[in-house]
Curated annotation (Swiss-Prot):
Gene: purT
PROSITE patterns, per database record: ATP_GRASP
Binding site for N(1)-(5-phospho-beta-D-ribosyl)glycinamide: E20, L21, E80, D284, K355, R362, R363
Species assigned in the record: Aeromonas hydrophila subsp. hydrophila (strain ATCC 7966 / DSM 30187 / BCRC 13018 / CCUG 14551 / JCM 1027 / KCTC 2358 / NCIMB 9240 / NCTC 8049)
Annotated EC: 6.3.1.21
Name this polypeptide is given: Formate-dependent phosphoribosylglycinamide formyltransferase
SUPFAM superfamilies: Glutathione synthetase ATP-binding domain-like, PreATP-grasp domain, Rudiment single hybrid motif
Pathway linked to the protein: Purine metabolism; IMP biosynthesis via de novo pathway; N(2)-formyl-N(1)-(5-phospho-D-ribosyl)glycinamide from N(1)-(5-phospho-D-ribosyl)glycinamide (formate route): step 1/1
Keyword Protein biosynthesis part of the UniProt annotation: no
Family under the similarity heading: Belongs to the PurK/PurT family.
Record note on quaternary structure: Homodimer.
Length: 392
């Protein structure tokens, strides 16, 4: 049973994280009459602009997070990013507050060490070789063990922050410092990963719901500086690789438990599959589903966390997304050329996130297109994204 938003019997959802992904989740929650309270570390975040109420706080501050939960009394808490006081979430869950998919999943996936040890050591899934390092001395030893080239990441970061590819020992200090500065919780442990000989990587959106586990068609994507630039669906791959990918994804989401959509990242070479990472929430590369499917990843996540059946997922054919990425400094971002951008590609769509400010490089929107094949859809989406003029 759901109540009506703003009424005494309202069903309330607290979004912890109010970026562009949270904004789409908020919209989908409101389709079921759910009252949405959006929280983030800064004011006027995208999801706050469509929520019933908004709160600004440091979500790594456990006392502040608990005070907010006590104030709004949510029926469910929906983590939408990694920088959260997960120990407090776990305690709240023990006290009867519903966290989706669950507090353990949020804890494990916030920290690369937790999810990597679960996948490789508990579930026995194939991954890249890895070592963790807490100190500079341990880092040097880990690089020596893994060998060059290797990938260095903070155990707590996202969107490529603090990540680097180390190819030369002369860059050892630089790589360590970059990882320390890029972690979400400040200085801390890093993971040193060996290269795997993959041909491409995919995101397999996997939904765990009351009516079982469901898979979206695989999503391919291109990354630059650790963050995605374009994504497309479906990614072409062998039947064996797809079947193996589903096996790996199902094992991971079953181990994490709870209901929701999980973005499972995998490396692929031929029929071989390696597990990379997982997020227990919608994935940025999955924004392509806003145009590629009848139920977007956000709609699927909301159905699952509300305990509703997913049913059948219909994919419309080759589709792509391309980000509107700009660099500058402003607290009054304006856009022009939107009509011209949409006119470039009949049927194309554009989402501007409404981010209140920019300081450096930031993702401000996404262009979406469908075509006869994925490469064409990618080029069309890129053309639409490039035509948008951003004024600072």
């Amino acid at each position: 049973m759901f109540g009506t938003a703003t009424r005494p019997g309202a069903t309330r959802a607290l979004l912890l994280g109010s970026g562009e992904l949270g904004k789409e989740v908020a919209i989908e929650l409101q389709r079921f009459g759910i009252e949405v309270i959006a929280a983030d570390r800064y004011a006027d975040a995208p999801a706050m602009q469509v929520a019933h109420k908004a709160h600004v706080l440091d979500m790594l501050d456990g006392a502040a997070l608990r005070a907010l939960v006590n104030e709004v009394k949510p029926d469910l808490i929906i983590p939408e990013l990694e920088a959260i006081a997960t120990d407090t979430l776990a305690a709240l869950e023990q006290e009867g507050v519903k966290v989706v998919p669950n507090a353990r999943a949020t804890q494990l996936t916030m920290n690369r060490e937790g999810i990597r040890r679960l996948a490789a050591e508990t579930l026995g899934l194939p991954t890249s070789p890895y070592h963790f390092a807490q100190s500079k001395e341990e880092f040097v030893a880990a690089v020596d063990t893994i060998g060059l080239p290797c990938v260095v990441k903070p155990v707590m970061s996202s969107s490529g922050k603090g990540q680097s590819v180390l190819r030369d020992l002369a860059k050892l200090d630089e790589s360590w410092t970059h990882a320390q500065e890029g972690g979400r919780a400040g200085r801390g442990k890093v993971i040193v990963e060996g290269f795997v000989p993959f041909e491409y990587e995919i995101t397999l959106l996997t939904v765990r719901a009351v009516d079982g586990i469901h898979f979206c068609q695989p999503i391919g994507h291109r990354q630059e500086d650790g963050d995605y630039r374009e994504s497309w669906q479906p990614q072409a791959m062998s039947e064996q690789a797809l079947a193996r990918s589903k096996e790996v994804a199902a094992k991971v989401v079953e181990a994490l438990g709870g209901y929701g959509l999980f973005g499972v990242e995998l490396f692929i070479k031929g029929d071989e599959v390696w597990f990379s990472e997982v997020s227990p929430r919608p994935h940025d590369t999955g924004m392509v589903t806003l145009i590629s499917q009848d139920l977007s990843e956000f709609a699927l996540h909301v159905r699952a966390i509300l305990g509703l059946p997913v049913g059948t997922i219909t994919q419309y054919g080759p589709s792509a997304s391309a980000v509107v990425l700009r660099e500058g400094h402003s607290q009054d971002i304006r856009y022009q050329g939107i009509g011209e951008a949409l006119a470039l590609v009949p049927g194309a769509q554009l989402r501007l996130f409404g981010k209140p400010e920019i300081a450096g490089r930031r993702r401000l929107g996404v262009a979406l297109a469908r075509a006869e094949d994925c490469p064409t859809a990618v080029e069309q989406a890129k053309a639409v994204a490039a035509r948008v003029d951003v004024l600072f």
